[in-house]
Amino acid sequence: MWYNLLNSAQTAQEKRKGYSMKIVLVGGGKVGTALARQLSEEGHNVTVIDTNKARVEHIGESYDVMSILGNGSSITTLSEAGVEEADVFIAVTGSDELNLLCCMFAKKAGHCHAIARVRNPSYSHELDFIKKQIGISAIINPEMAAAKEISHLPVSYTHLRAHETGRNL
């Protein structure tokens, strides 16, 4: 899902020319680290911001990314990360509210696509309103995304058996 959103941020012309995007990522936990690794391996210019010194050092030493120790909701830190020139901004901290705040500040400071991870199901009915009011390109709820993917899988025994044996129904 992240990959599709990032892909849509690039124009077809940029993809043909091998254009690498400038991506600022707030949150160096499991998801943030995995994203930093994947995006840097794809040749993008990635900057990771986190408040945990050990995480920042690990990410900076392990991957071809710039890592900054700081608060992703600080305009000073966002400026240091180059959010003004960023194509994409992604917030994946452990706090939904911090993710939304970071995206709001990033949108005000630059002209990037902003993506926030929001896990709390109580926000699920307000996501469109939040996206519109803050100007966020996408809000991703991992649990809802997983449920949507699973719902597209064949669930009947007949379909599962046909898939197992390679027969078409």
Where are these regions (language model features)?
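Conserved acidic E/D residue at the C-terminus of a beta-strand in Rossmann-like folds
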Residues: 50-51
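N-terminal Rossmann-fold NAD(P) dinucleotide-binding loop
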Residues: 32
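Single conserved hydrophobic/aromatic residue that forms the stacking wall/gate
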Residues: 159-169
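Phosphate-bearing ligand-interacting subdomains
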Residues: 57-153
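Short, Lys/Arg-enriched N-terminal segments with co-localized hydrophobic residues
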Residues: 1-20
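Glycine-rich Rossmann-fold phosphate-binding loop(s) that bind the pyrophosphate
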Residues: 28-29
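Aromatic pocket-lining residues of Rossmann-like dinucleotide-binding sites
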Residues: 39
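Beta1/beta-strand and adjacent pyrophosphate-binding region of the FAD-binding site
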Residues: 22-25
